[in-house]
Amino acid sequence: RVTSPVRKGITMEWFQAALDRYKQQHHQGHAAPKPERTHSMRSVPAPIVYTRTRSVQVPEPVLREQRIMAGFDAGPFVDAFKILRTQVMHRIREKGWNVIGVTSPGEQEGKTFTAVNLAASIAMDVTQSVLLVDANLRHPSVHEMFDLGECQGLADYLLDDVPIEQLLVHPGIGRFVFLPGGRTVSHSAEALTSPKMLALVEECKHRYQSRMILFDLPPILQTSDV
C-alpha cells in the first residue's frame, strides 16, 4: 500500500482560488494573451536523450487543451502548481520520502489532472526526475492526458510479465517519465496488492532514490484498491 504525504490542507486556499480563476478564464475564452516565447521564460531543463524509453513529443496544443502546465508560459495556473510543488517537496524531504500517492474521494474530481501537473512541475526543476505510475487499473487515464491511444502499462507488467523498460513513456517534458496503466483490470485490488506490485514499489523506492515516484491511485471511497 502506498501512503501519500499529500494532505488536503497542503494545497491551501489560494491554490484553489488560482485554479478557479484559471477555469473561469478558460471557459469564458478570455485567457491572457500568450507572451512571446524566449528561452529564459521556462524552467524546463535541457532535453534528455532517452535510449531505452519510448519518447513521444506531445504537441503544445495538446498540452494546452489538456491543461498540462508544460504548455503554458506563466499565469496563476502555472504558479499554483509550482507552489504546490514547493510545498510537497518541502514535506517529503523533511520526512525522507521519495514515493507519494495522489487520490481523491470519488471519480471525476481532478486527481489525475493534479498528479500529471504535479509530476510535470517537479520534472521541470533541473535537479529532479520523476516517474508517474498510473495505478488506477479500473480506469487508467494518464495516457489520455497526453492524447495517446491505448497502450501497454502496469497491468501488462503485473499480469503478463512485460518488462518495465518496454512500457515507460517520456512525453517530452523535462525529466518526466510515466508508466501507463495498460489494459483495464476489473479485479484491480488483487493486482495492486500482489507481491509483484509490492516488489515494484520497493524497487522504485530504493533503486531510484534521487527520483520522485508518484502514483495516480484509484478513488479512495469507491474501491478497495487504495
Please place each PLM-identified region on the residue numbering.
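P-loop NTP-binding module
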Residues: R1-V226
